[in-house]
Amino acid sequence: MTTSFKFDSYEDFCKASVDEKNHYVYTRGSNPTTVKLENILAQLDHGEKCKVFASGMGAISATLFSLLKQGDHLLMINTIYGEAASFAQYLHNFGIESDRIDVANTDEIFQHVKENTKIIYFESPSSEKFEMLDLQKIANFAKKHNILTVIDATWASPLFTKPIDFGIDLVIHSLSKYVGGHSDVLGGSVVGSNKLVNQIFEYGHQFLDSTNSPFNSWLAIRGLRTLPLRMQHANQAIKVVLDALKDDDRIKRIYHPYCSENEQKELAQKYLKGYGSLFAFDLNTDDLEKVKIFINSLKTISIGVSWGGYESLALAVYKGNNLSALKKRKLEPTHIRIFVGLEDPNVILDDIKHALDTAFK
């Protein structure tokens, strides 16, 4: 842990100070512990280089800030992390256009591309509805039109998806989720080519100053040591829970690639090596009081934001005063998100069923 590095000579300092991304000068730019984390993540994501940030949102904002300029157009697909969508709106102040579109299949994306589109940004599976997109088809189209592709792949972790193998330019992860894995660290990463990541370092990282602390980098490295075991548990646990819930008539619809059909199932099989344990469902009711009763009846599952740590979490999208916003996002007000943590999945399943029994009695 240090903020500043010492040099043996004037010449050594001069050499390092003009190339801070490859030398240790000041921890705001680079640090040995953070570089170790970056090297591991680049290898896991099959990219040339990685830059780590203090949060996932730090990685997202630095990437968009670095690669877009006045007059450019940003195209965002389906439901994405809300703060990323808000940041895109903020970029309008700098003359950067953006649109967020909802599509049923990948081919619909391309009719929304403009002459000035510079980035196609998406999640796959998407936030909230967990829809899959055809990564290879998006990448092929984008390369023909000189458009960059950026995916937030946090849901599947670096172990269960490899977007760069299918031509995606940049992969973002929130390290606060599966990589950290213990609900005690914030962080974000972007992985891609040397050229693009160096550009993000020079502008987004250095100017926006979302620097990850060496200690947080160490915590993320600690998390990576158990990531394979935790993802194996996630893959097995989510199947236990979803197999038991899929025929429950109190649930209108389940959102998760494991429960998908037809083309969505084919895309999941092509692009996912396993399943993350974050899912959602709509309660089969118009009585919004049942949403509150369900959430308040959970005993093992905690109520809270974020996910990817050790504990199971639940979150309802309906907050009592946001029906118009949910309609705009095309979400049912009875939509509930659940993360299955490291507990015994049967314990989590019993908790969900108890809450359903209480809400629908």
Q: What does each model-identified segment do?
A:
Residues 6, 32, 253, 308-310, ...:
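Positively charged, small/polar-rich N-terminal and surface patches that mediate targeting and assembly
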Residues 7-58, 83-90:
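Conserved N-terminal alpha-helix of the aminotransferase class I/II PLP-enzyme fold
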Residues 21, 185, 215, 274-278, ...:
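Short, solvent-exposed beta-strand edge segments and adjacent coil->beta transition regions
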Residues 49-250, 255, 266:
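Conserved PLP-enzyme active-site core in the AAT-like
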Residues 88-89, 98, 118, 285, ...:
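PLP-dependent enzyme catalytic core of the Aspartate aminotransferase-like
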Residues 239-299, 303-309, 322-327:
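Conserved small-domain helix->loop->beta segment predominantly found in fold-type I
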